[in-house]
């Protein structure tokens, strides 16, 4: 059977068929497979699209595109982008993106017979315009069709020196060619045909050599049993069939033209234990990669360094260091070698902190243009001077994060999961190898944390709002399946990238689940608080059976007066019989209400009494400044349990209603403490200062922001701040231990007194 007779195949000339007969039978029926066989064969017009005649339906589509482009030709690019952003979910959004591309080509390119311009250079400028206007660009294949449609007489030629040649469009040029020559150019591997949501920056020609050096270094690092077992478990779970179309793993991507795919990368240990191979010595490094363009090993770990900064390189084969502001697993390290399923086997311990009420995002910012990722230089293990590679990776990852944030903002959660699935495939092998390198894992972790922070800021007003049930169902589905989805997507990539992406997603999923629990319990508590009869029943049982002074004296060992006053104020909020108008506006007659409360009242909360109670508990931690957040939550839970126990033992009827309210208080206060610790950026600034202090040899002065250059000049003051922070934490730990010892002594004394009273009573009775 002649291959040209197959449906959809382009007719080949006799000379082309002779070349085809010499190929392998498997390759014979795939014309695209013949492209890399012979360089002269690439320029034959018989297998290119120039000789192909479009079908009738294609002619109609091209005519329609030309007509639409002619109608919108007088519009500015800003107005076209605004219309595209408004109709980005409609059925005609893809066609209108093509119209935008044609309009941009008419403004940016012009025909000239003796001109030639790189094919990727035109696409790079188009992507840059789309990035500045915050719209999703077309992929390179669709954009190339538009170039052919607008300029049908151009030809594609491969020009340049051997080994450095690039594809060029011959017959057109960019308008103002001199102004574009100052910009960097793309290499052919910098863009992928499926890159439809990334905004890449131009990458120099030596970028692939730089990444291959990193890859060769990574391949020589020995893999630990824990990481291999963990990655194998995740890969085993990844191949399980799933009904979710977004949970399918992506195809494996060959790295830098290698014949083997990256199926299971080793776990990267500390680089100082593995020196660079002989083939990567300074004498063998190409001239364009000299002077620290290949990342150097990290300096040896100093014993005198603080615990907060004791790991210059993340150890992915073991658990995190306790005491840091990040989330640490509570499992034993030996158990982490047996299972890596974060969704079911790892329990995370969040840093808790009660932020002031005015710092909580009750009214989040909707300006996505202000979003920015942390600089890469602060989170690199060693000096890395390839500015172009870092800029390209940062720009692509920033666009990916912005797309995810906007998907959650408009509740397009299917698009959220689809973007996560398509992101690895949209990267070129060079950028994917750089993303999987252990030198950038710390930056990826911080970037994902910044992105998830912005998403939680958008969702934070749901704490006390009435949310439609379909939205709750979608968010609950996202919280339950995000970790498994990311694990299946990155199962075929390096183990360090898989672990970082999975851990940050698990933290976000836990916080999102906590937010949904707060919203559910708030609705349940509002049913009782909005009913005057239930509230009257609670207050009646409280007056009859609860003695706040006795409960505080029995459960706590400090701040008795303040704790008694807090319980009495809580009772006064419950006992207030509000009229319907006051329920809608509980702060109508309270001039001392804070601005935060006024902002939340404007958001039309669930219930006035619930809103007032939320304000009370939100301000309550500030009354106990010497109490840590975790100790505060334990004491609050002990007081509520004691109140419930007194009412239950005494036969009160308000136990059920008070129990539901208590559940909401526990969830709400835990959520406020967890989100406060997660959104707190004071530790991030301190960590960046420390990274600047220790990596000053690898960061040029021009790359350091002005507000951080002062810290580089005052190293002694920074060390004093670190020592002061250590001493303050040590004092706090000593104070907590003394408080626990006093509490235990008080409990023991109470038990002894109780036993003596029982014995005296029995003796008197006998």
Curated annotation (Swiss-Prot):
Lineage top rank: taxon: Eukaryota
Region entry Disordered, spans: 271-308, 708-731
GO cellular component, one term: nucleus
Comp. bias regions, Low complexity: 290-308, 715-731
A Pfam family that the UniProt record links to this protein: BCD_RFX
Chief location category: nucleus
UniProt keywords, alphabetically: DNA-binding, Nucleus, Phosphoprotein
Phosphoserine modification, residue list: 223-224, 227
GO biological process, one term: positive regulation of transcription by RNA polymerase II
Compartment(s) of residence: Nucleus
PROSITE patterns reported in the protein's UniProt record: RFX_DBD
Annotated region of DNA binding: 101-176
Molecular function terms, GO-annotated: DNA-binding transcription activator activity, RNA polymerase II-specific; DNA-binding transcription factor activity, RNA polymerase II-specific; RNA polymerase II cis-regulatory region sequence-specific DNA binding
Transmembrane segments: none
Compositionally biased residues, Polar residues: 279-289
Family that this chain belongs to: Belongs to the RFX family.
Function: Positively regulates cyclic AMP-dependent protein kinase-mediated exit from the mitotic cell cycle.
Name this protein carries in UniProt: Protein sak1
């Amino acid at each position: 059977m002649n291959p040209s007779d197959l449906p959809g195949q382009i007719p080949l000339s006799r000379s082309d068929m002779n070349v085809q007969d010499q190929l392998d039978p498997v390759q014979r029926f795939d014309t695209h497979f013949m492209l890399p066989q012979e360089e002269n064969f690439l320029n034959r017009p018989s297998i290119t699209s120039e000789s192909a005649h479009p079908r009738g339906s294609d002619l109609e589509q091209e005519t329609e595109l030309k007509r639409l482009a002619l109608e919108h030709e007088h519009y500015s690019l800003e107005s076209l982008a605004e219309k595209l952003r408004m109709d980005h979910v409609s059925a005609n959004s893809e066609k209108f993106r093509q119209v935008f591309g044609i309009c941009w080509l008419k403004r940016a390119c012009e025909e000239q017979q003796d001109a030639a311009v790189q094919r990727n250079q035109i696409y790079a400028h188009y992507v840059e315009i789309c990035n500045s206007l915050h719209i999703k660009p077309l992929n390179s294949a669709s954009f190339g069709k538009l170039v052919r449609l607008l300029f049908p007489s151009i030809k594609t030629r491969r020009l340049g020196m051997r080994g450095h040649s690039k594809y060029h469009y011959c017959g057109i040029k960019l308008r103002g060619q001199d102004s574009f020559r100052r910009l960097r150019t793309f290499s052919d591997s910098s863009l992928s045909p499926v890159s439809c949501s990334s905004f890449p920056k131009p990458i120099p020609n030596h970028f692939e050599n730089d990444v291959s050096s990193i890859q060769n270094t990574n391949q020589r690092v020995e893999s630990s049993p824990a990481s291999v077992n963990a990655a194998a478990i995740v890969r085993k779970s990844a191949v399980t069939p799933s009904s979710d179309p977004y949970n399918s793993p992506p195809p494996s991507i060959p790295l830098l033209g290698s014949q083997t795919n990256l199926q299971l990368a080793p776990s990267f240990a500390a680089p100082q234990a593995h020196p660079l191979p002989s083939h990567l010595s300074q004498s063998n490094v190409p001239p364009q990669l000299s002077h620290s363009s290949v990342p150097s090993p990290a300096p040896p770990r100093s014993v005198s360094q603080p615990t907060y900064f004791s790991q210059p390189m993340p150890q992915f084969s073991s658990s995190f260091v306790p005491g840091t502001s990040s989330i640490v697993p509570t499992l034993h390290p030996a158990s982490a070698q047996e299972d890596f399923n974060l969704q079911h086997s790892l329990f995370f311990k969040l840093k808790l902190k009660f932020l002031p009420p005015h710092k909580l995002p009750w009214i989040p910012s909707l300006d996505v243009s202000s979003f920015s990722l942390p600089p890469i230089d602060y989170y690199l293990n060693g000096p890395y001077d390839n500015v172009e590679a870092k800029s390209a990776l940062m720009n692509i990852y920033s666009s990916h994060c912005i797309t995810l944030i906007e998907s959650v903002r408009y509740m397009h959660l299917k698009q959220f999961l689809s973007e996560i699935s398509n992101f690895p495939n949209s990267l070129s092998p060079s950028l994917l190898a750089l993303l999987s390198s252990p030198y950038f894992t710390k930056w990826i972790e911080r970037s994902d944390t910044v992105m998830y922070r912005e998403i939680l800021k958008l969702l934070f007003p749901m704490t006390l709002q009435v949310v439609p049930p379909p939205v709750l169902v979608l968010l609950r589905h996202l919280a339950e399946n995000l970790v498994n989805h990311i694990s299946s997507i990155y199962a075929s990539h390096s183990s360090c990238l898989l672990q970082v992406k999975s851990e940050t997603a698990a933290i976000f999923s836990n916080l999102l689940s906590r937010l949904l629990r707060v919203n559910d319990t708030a609705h349940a508590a509002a049913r009782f608080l909005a009913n005057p009869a239930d509230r009257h029943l609670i207050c009646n049982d409280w007056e009859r059976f609860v003695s706040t002074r006795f409960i505080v004296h029995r459960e706590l060992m400090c701040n008795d007066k303040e704790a008694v006053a807090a319980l009495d104020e809580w009772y006064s909020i419950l006992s207030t019989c509000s009229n319907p108008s006051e329920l809608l506006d509980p702060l109508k007659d309270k001039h001392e209400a804070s601005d935060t409360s006024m902002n939340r009242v404007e958001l039309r909360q669930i219930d006035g009494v619930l809103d007032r109670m939320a304000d009370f508990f939100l301000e309550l931690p500030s009354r106990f400044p010497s109490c840590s957040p975790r100790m505060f939550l334990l004491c609050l839970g002990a007081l509520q349990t004691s109140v419930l126990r007194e009412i239950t033992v005494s036969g009160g009827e308000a136990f059920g209603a008070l129990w539901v309210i208590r559940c909401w208080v526990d969830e709400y206060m835990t959520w406020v403490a967890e989100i406060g610790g997660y959104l707190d950026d004071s530790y991030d600034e301190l960590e960046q200062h420390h990274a600047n202090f220790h990596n000053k040899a690898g960061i040029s002065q021009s790359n350091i922001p002005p507000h951080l250059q002062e810290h580089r000049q005052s190293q002694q003051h920074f060390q004093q701040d670190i020592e002061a922070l250590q001493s303050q934490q040590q004092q706090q730990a000593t104070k907590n231990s003394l408080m626990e010892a006093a509490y235990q002594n008080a409990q023991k004394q109470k038990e002894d007194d109780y036993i003596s009273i029982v014995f005296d009573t029995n003796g008197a009775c006998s």
